[in-house]
Amino acid sequence: MPSTTLSTVLSDINDFVVKQGHGVKGLSELGLQTLPNQYVHPPEERLSSMDVVSDDSIPVIDVSNWEDPKVAKLICDAAEKRGFFQIVNHGIPIEMLEKAKAATYRFFREPAEEKKKYSKENCPTSHVRYSTSFLPQIEKALEWKDHLSMFYVSDEEAAQYWPPSCRDDAVEYLKSCEMVSRKLLEALMQGLNVNQIDDSKESLLMGSRRININYYPKCPNPDLTVGVGRHSDISTLTLLLQDDIGGLYVRKLEHEAWSHVPPVKGALVINIGDALQIMSNGRYKSIEHRVMANESNDRISVPVFVNPRPNDIVGPLPEVLASGEKPVYKPVLYSDYAKHFYRKAHNGKDTIAFARIE
């Protein structure tokens, strides 16, 4: 692209990246030599090598035998002590994982004119949203990431509204994650003295599902920005499929240090969300995590968020409090909690205070 055109783009980043639908991917492909000021984050929000614990990582759990009590114990221990773990031999074929990744690339390689059909301004449903950064309209510093978010209601709605370039593989992958989610939650509920997930519990734990596809293009100055800022998820569980590039970092519980989550072929990264932290009365931990930008490679990831339904009341489960344990959190309407999360830029775990009993 001629330098004059590049200068024009840089003079109005919001128009090019957000309104025209090019995203940060389009910005990266201009051949930038330096990071635009809009993406420069304050030093305290950047991650340096001094902050990373190199000899520490989250557990990798073989779940080939879901019925083994030892597997359930490993899952519960990881949820209590780390909030993050990886699972292997989970039953989703490698071929399906690869198809989900390929679908991600297909969508983001579409022309900007096609992608922007799914922006807030253009898409006829709020259940599908193409965007860049997290909340670009209010953030002081933008995140180096594009994403497409798809809230699943039915196959019929997906067929009508989800992008054709990724729809079929995204729906298939999302459905394949349902069994894994259920098995994980069965194990986690055992640790909370919940012996059976009945219909009401199932709705509360996994009543709604959302799949995102994320694209992190290579960045000219990755040390000055973030792929995703510090945050915890508001889900019950998140199941993350990452590629082989790496870049996800997790805060160590009660420490300022961070651990890298190395890609493991065929694995899914599992993390506890705020909703499950609240339901477990703090026993299971929803942990801050972040994504670093990369100078050499484009990176993708595919998270599936397993959530309560918007009209569900989320609070400590009765089984958790049955022994007389004092509640740490008050019951909250899940849609109110979600609105609180989306009110401002990523800022660690501050959203959980919305439900905490003072």
UniProtKB/Swiss-Prot annotation:
Recorded effect of pH on activity: Optimum pH is 7.2.
Annotated source species: Ipomoea batatas
Positions contributing to 2-oxoglutarate binding: 216, 299, 301
Catalytic activity: (E)-4-coumaroyl-CoA + 2-oxoglutarate + O2 = (E)-2,4-dihydroxycinnamoyl-CoA + succinate + CO2; (E)-feruloyl-CoA + 2-oxoglutarate + O2 = (E)-6-hydroxyferuloyl-CoA + succinate + CO2
Family assignment from sequence similarity: Belongs to the iron/ascorbate-dependent oxidoreductase family.
GO terms, molecular function: 2-oxoglutarate-dependent dioxygenase activity; 4-coumaroyl 2'-hydroxylase activity; metal ion binding
InterPro entries hit by this protein: DIOX_N, IPNS-like_FE2OG_OXY, IPNS-like_sf, Oxoglu/Fe-dep_dioxygenase_dom
Keyword field contains Cell membrane: no
PROSITE patterns listed in its UniProt record: FE2OG_OXY
Cofactor: L-ascorbate; Fe(2+)
Residue ranges of domain Fe2OG dioxygenase in the record: 200-308
Single GO BP term: response to fungus
EC number: 1.14.11.61, 1.14.11.62
Function: 2-oxoglutarate (OG)- and Fe(II)-dependent dioxygenase (2OGD) involved in scopoletin and umbelliferone biosynthesis. Converts feruloyl CoA into 6'-hydroxyferuloyl CoA, and p-coumaroyl CoA into 2,4-dihydroxycinnamoyl-CoA, but has no activity toward caffeoyl-CoA.
Sorted UniProt keywords: Dioxygenase, Iron, Metal-binding, Oxidoreductase
Cofactor mode of binding and number, as noted: Binds 1 Fe(2+) ion per subunit.
Residues involved in Fe cation binding: 231, 233, 289
Transmembrane segments: none
Pathway: Phenylpropanoid metabolism
Protein name per its UniProtKB record: Bi-functional coumaroyl CoA and feruloyl CoA ortho-hydroxylase F6H2-2-1
Tissues expressing the protein: Mostly expressed in underground stems and stems.
Induction section of the entry: Transiently induced by fungal (F.oxysporum f.sp. batatas O-17) and chitosan treatments, in association with the accumulation of umbelliferone and its glucoside (skimmin) in the tubers.
